[in-house]
Amino acid sequence: MSLNKVQEKILADFAQKNKHWPKAQLDAALWQVKWQLTALPHQKEPEGGEYDTFLMLAGRGSGKTHTASHWIGIRAWQYPGTRWLVTAPTTNDIRATCFEGDSGLLNIIPHSLIKDYNKSLGEITLINGSLIQGIPASEPERYRGKQYHGAWFDELCAFEYNDDAYDGV
């Protein structure tokens, strides 16, 4: 999402006010402020109350991937040393859409916060020790024992082993 002039001013003022912060801390804060300024109403998670599922059911181009990348990326940053699962129907879906796509994690999370991207293992490690792991829904047995702190199920309706995938997490 592009910023309007008011949003640009808010970000510039925030950056100026906090320029003494370490780069990673400032980049993370600017990322989160920018997301709050630009997220559309249907892209914001529900307010208030505890919940264990946040479902975004919407059409093509509505920002589902963009929303999920921000949601899981911000949490992985806010909770150091945590483990997060990204799953989609195939390994290629994870790589091409969820990790490397235009709205994928590698284009959403500030580069200064990413320690490593292991393409062959499908893992993004943040500098705070959090791990975002991509495992295809076609291999739900690989979810077991990982004790993830949260998960992003992309294109859940296309999962071959829907129940096994959901139950495994």
Give residue spans per PLM region.
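Phosphate/NTP-binding elements of NTP-utilizing enzymes
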Residues: 2-169
